[in-house]
């Protein structure tokens, strides 16, 4: 674990959820560039009632919020906002590890900030749709003239960032690069200047689904989900408990409800906007169904056991590509099934999930496959299922 040295002190940060033999750092130079910028311009948080209020967007592991908290008289001078449950949980866990107050002010998307900020620092999100939506959100919730600083690593920055800032904020420019990171600056216009296309609508089966900004499959249902829809359980017993794990817009769980009206489906996602998309879609088309919605790290925090868990695992975690998220969700599913229950998984053929699944389940069978995807049915968790691989 590499110490994070910032203008007001030092933090020991870990990525969350914790995993053994972690090789990825919990901060980068874009975080440090934002903090250095505030310090160089005399915008560090100070003591007293006149300390500036700072709004932080898209803090990845708590590096920004916690560094500012070390400079602040109170954690209440800092408010964080973002779409990711795991990012918010990372900030809390790292706060505890560093002896800081974990009770940071937090506002989820679609909500207004709890306090009027004097300055904003923002990590540029991976999703262009989420970037557009957040820039418009800032234009509608900030007083005119509030300084806004954005940063990201050069290799991840969208080329259209400055034009998007100018469209939604009315101004914006790129600053100097530093250690493969780049800073951008703007001022809040004090009013909404342009509309976004979000939430958008996507046609799936006989439904027209709400899809909020940043949620996977913005324009149309992805090909993996379309293949999975043809291989879902259709004869579940009355009251069967089903989890749509990593539900996105909710289409998989909704298809289960269509075929099994008496099923009880729990929609799970770590994205607040994904879960809001699913909630909106289920309430529109299945208002009488017994449905539940869980914002969290997969199934963590749920005591319920399921007859069937459905999973189309992501192999991107932000800018990181790998199977570590899938492994964690497989581990959770293996301990969350009732006796005789099943995990049904779809994955890209080249990812070789069957090898990992065979270490967690005594029975792993192929239900369907095509040139690109495989659908597996997994039953009978192995004795080692309670010992995570990661």
UniProtKB/Swiss-Prot annotation:
The keyword RNA-binding does not apply. CDD domains: AdoMet_MTases. Keywords: Cytoplasm, Methyltransferase, rRNA processing, S-adenosyl-L-methionine, Transferase. It catalyses: guanosine(1835) in 23S rRNA + S-adenosyl-L-methionine = N(2)-methylguanosine(1835) in 23S rRNA + S-adenosyl-L-homocysteine + H(+). GO terms for molecular function: 23S rRNA (guanine(1835)-N(2))-methyltransferase activity; nucleic acid binding. InterPro entries: DNA_methylase_N6_adenine_CS, rRNA_m2G-MeTrfase_RlmG, RsmC/RlmG, SAM-dependent_MTases_sf, Small_mtfrase_dom. Its EC number is 2.1.1.174. One of its GO terms (cellular component) is cytoplasm. It is found in: Cytoplasm. Belongs to the methyltransferase superfamily. RlmG family. Specifically methylates the guanine in position 1835 (m2G1835) of 23S rRNA. This is Ribosomal RNA large subunit methyltransferase G. It comes from Alcanivorax borkumensis (strain ATCC 700651 / DSM 11573 / NCIMB 13689 / SK2).
